[in-house]
């Protein structure tokens, strides 16, 4: 793999991330004269569903997306031994999960600045007919003051002619909407909105809104509604947005367009 990438102008560095069927490595691009990230996907190591269904979707989707708050893919390479390499923009600030883990809850103004960018990225995706389906703090990367979404491994292009209803569980349990956990036919875009609510909650509280160690208990908590630690003094507008994002009834949950108009995001 190292020789293959070197022959294509990339000097491999350290591993900066690891997925079920992939690794992300830092590299130096001689062509671009800068550091890049290379996601190495092992086609031979994954199950048939991943190879036949999810991987082709990811490769199709990342080719088409172009937004300042989405990690850019520069090039795709495939080695003779079935490894696919996605050469991507490198975000050197780590991810939101590590930021909160190391620094604690973010000030509301900082969370708002980052969350606005996530809203813009998802608004763009949904406008392109793409649902991410795996939004979580680990997939929100930081580059200075900018947030950039990554990992479209579970993403799906939605039909334009009618509303798509999915029954597939994708992503991480802690960030999954109640209808996704219950296997009810659901709108994947509304699932993204719920996951964004969990991301915002983690940014502000440095904890998850619901206990993901016990799924029946988690579903009960979700129906009961989100509560906030009193010592953090989260503003009324922000609490209102979080309650809307984490609305257990997907019909009542706002679309990404409606989220973008919320007073908390409009205020400075």
Swiss-Prot record:
Q: Where in the cell is it found?
A: Cell projection, Cilium, Flagellum
**Residues that bear Phosphothreonine:** 168
Q: What keywords are annotated for this sequence in UniProt?
A: ATP-binding, Cell projection, Cilium, Developmental protein, Differentiation, Flagellum, Kinase, Magnesium, Metal-binding, Nucleotide-binding, Phosphoprotein, Serine/threonine-protein kinase, Spermatogenesis, Transferase
- What EC number(s) does its UniProt record assign? 2.7.11.1
Q: What is this protein called?
A: Testis-specific serine/threonine-protein kinase 3
Q: What SUPFAM superfamilies does UniProt report for this protein, alphabetically?
A: Protein kinase-like (PK-like) (SSF56112)
Function, in words: Serine/threonine protein kinase required for spermatid development and male fertility.
Gene Ontology BP annotations: protein phosphorylation; spermatid development; spermatogenesis
Catalytic activity line of the entry: L-seryl-[protein] + ATP = O-phospho-L-seryl-[protein] + ADP + H(+); L-threonyl-[protein] + ATP = O-phospho-L-threonyl-[protein] + ADP + H(+)
Instruction: Identify the Gene3D superfamilies for this entry.
Output: Transferase(Phosphotransferase) domain 1
Active site as annotated: 134
Gene Ontology cellular-component terms listed: sperm flagellum
**Which positions bear Phosphoserine?**
166
Where is the Protein kinase domain positioned along the sequence? 10-265
Q: Which InterPro entries match?
A: Kinase-like_dom_sf, Prot_kinase_dom, Protein_kinase_ATP_BS, TSSK3_STKc
Summarize where ATP binds, as residue positions.
16-24, 39
Catalytic EC class: transferase
Report activity regulation. Answer: Activated by phosphorylation on Thr-168 by PDPK1.
Record-linked SMART domains: S_TKc
**Annotated family:** Belongs to the protein kinase superfamily. CAMK Ser/Thr protein kinase family.
Cofactor binding, note field: Can use both Mg(2+) and Mn(2+) as cofactor, with a preference for Mn(2+) in vitro.
